[in-house]
Amino acid sequence: MTDSVRSYLRSLLPAAATLLAAGSLTAAEAVQPARGPFWSGTIMRSKSEAAAMKGLAVTLGNEGRSYVVYDLDTMRLAAAWTGEFLEFGNTLTKIEWPPPPTVKGTNIVFDSKLGPGWADKAGSLADPRTGTQGPLPKDWAHYSGLYVHDDRVVLSYTVGTTPVLELPGFVNASGQPIFARTLQFPKGAQNLTVLLADGISGAVATDFVGDQAGPVTVSFKDGRSLTIGGSGLPKGSRLESTPEGKLVVKLAKLAKNDSVRLLFSSEANPGGFFAVSQKKPLDLRPYTEGGGVHWPEDVTTVGKVGTEEGPYQVDTITEPFPNPYNVSTFFGGFDFLPDGRAAICTFHGDVWVVSGLDDKLEKLTWKRFATGLFQPLGLKVVKGDIYVAGRDQITRLKDVNKDGEADFYENFNNDTVVTPNYHEFVLDLHTDSKGNFYYAKGAPWEPSVSSPHQGTILKVTPDGKKMEVFASGLRAPNGMTVGPDDTVLVGDNQGHWMPSSKLNLVKPGAFMGMTPAAQKSLTLRYTNGTEIVGNPSDPEFRKANKLKGWDSAMPIPVSYDEPIAWVPMRWDNSSGGQVYVTSDKWGPWKGAPLFMSYGKCLLYGVMTEKVGDTTQAALVPFGLKFASGVMRGRFSSKDGQLYLAGLKGWQNAASRDGGFYRVRYTGKPVTMPVKTRTGKNGIQLTFATELDAKSAEDVQSYAVELWNYKYSGAYGSPEFSVKTPGKQGHDKLEVKSAKLSADKKTLLLEVDGLEVANQYSVKYSLTAANGAEVRSEVIGTIHKLGPELSATR
């Protein structure tokens, strides 16, 4: 750790610094997390006014009590202030439902409103975006990423085709607080206009050149004043205001690698500006090469190897908490590096790398690799690079100087639109065989959709240059997967327009039922048969037709892409992700998907069947319990075993904030069914083990039920009879016969009255051929009945 980093951490967290020196955290709850030199998130100027949707808050000097916020959608410096940082409540240490943080410091030196931070090539600062949402066109201004060097943060972006490096800073010039923006142009620049501040009173028009430009004092409409100076400004540069009250600097021609520095203070003392201007603007290139280590202390934990009976054991990969940095470990996504280590992100913005994933788990070593990300809940490793999906962007993390920490946080793609709504999480991250990236994005709560990406699956090209909506109509899709054949699966959980949790097989352009998040035109039908046509994601369409978006009396779509399996609340109240079994070392499940319940902390096997062009599925529990809400899964290429990760939040049964687990196949007999079929005469179950014929062919060993759900804008649905529509309850069906195949693995249950239903259940109590008890339940969905079945395979 360099002296500057150590000084920075001590100034930021006096209490934590003592604990860091001691190497322990005996009073972890008494100190705030060590958050690093920057923090990403939506940042509010007040409760009703956003400073930046994709905000980057950078801590500067002044003993860690000076800050700036950038809007990375528009490359605008949104605010600069001193004093307190942001009002987080408990959101740095817990998962709660508050609005985004607001600027806590009261001394805001200057700020600007939502809009472009640089003028376009015609010199205009007029915002071209719809509803001031999303990034500017890439040929206007585009964020490339940021470099971390000790306590400095250097932003990299383009204005038009001009690359720009920017270093924010703060100087205490003999008691005068001065903020600084150092801008460097690696390829030179010509005729660029940069926004400084908004809300200027009166007109400003003056030359602004040389190594001691200004200082010039301007007044804000709210009574504040701001003094601006600069150095390194080329001849012909101007400080001007616009009729809209924006203060800008028009930069004349700059040579390759020229740097300029813009200075800002709430005090008009020219002496402070003169003192700062004596120093030449920094060459920022050395700060892009990596600096000192920020997080020198690794955390060592001891895992717990499962010792339960059965074919699958749960091993616990003990999380790095407590840790010297007092950061929580609500795990959000993970993947494996080529050498077998795992990279895992946390909801509060960290990425850890863990080694020691061997048979015994006796020494797990955790290294804090990155921090400051915007609620990352997905992570994917591609060709050794770590990609992290946050609410603002997919970030590619680069360790420039190979010291074990990320130095360059590259913006791989930030085309997604962000709003302040807490419920629009970005969830999971996967790639297909062509290298395209996929992630899911939640719909808002309340479900008044206000952006084109809420409630969708988004697809990003392998080079990160283009993003598109792959599918829509999602509510809270906490996890998905892309299978070996590029099959896309995604879960969703009960709520408005979601009668129950479910598993979707997703085709391009699919609409999966969450009506306010359709993101396209639909035909909606009222109960009286009246139809209207329009896009329910459009606020104007909703307003014109008085659509609330979550009322049970609202019109429903005439059709939507139904799930391959509904999942009842008692099995899963909040779905996690899915993962395909790709390993030969994990028993009889290779090629099948697995389904995680975040809410119940459980794991299920998925058995799909195809009837004509219709795919439907059934689920069976593994009977394993996890201490956290499992929602991400990957198979390790090193040991062939399943790894799961998850966290504790609302609506789940977790006992630990974060958990990382290995589900290990022991080689013992698996007594679960691994295949199902439904036909006109009944249900066929194929087990992984031989069954005892006597118990298998006893009809009293089974109980079969059917039920439906009601699709509407209401929150969830009761369970309704299929036979008597409108009546709450299940239909109990008679098992007329049970026949076992010659290999003693496949059962045919001849069921009287089996028909198409949202949900069926088969409970069974059997004995395996080796005498083991085989007792569980299968639930599934029947969209279409296949032909008559037999007990033969």
Give residue ranges: language-model regions.
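Acidic, Ser/Thr/Gly/Pro-rich low-complexity segments and short DxT(G/T)-type signature motifs
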Residues: 277, 283, 667-673, 692, ...
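Short, surface-exposed alpha-helix to beta-strand junction/turn motifs within ectodomains of secreted
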Residues: 690-736, 762-768, 776-780
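N-terminal pre-domain segments of enzymes
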Residues: 27-56, 267-315, 786-793
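Beta-propeller domains with acidic blade repeats across secreted/periplasmic ectodomains
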Residues: 276-670, 693
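Beta-strand-rich N-terminal accessory domains
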Residues: 27-180, 191-217
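Structural beta-strand segments of beta-rich domains
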Residues: 179-181, 681-685, 747
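Extended acidic/polar, glycine-enriched regions
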Residues: 219-295
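Short, hydrophobic/aromatic-enriched beta-strand segments in well-ordered soluble domains
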Residues: 155-159, 181-185, 192-198, 245, ...
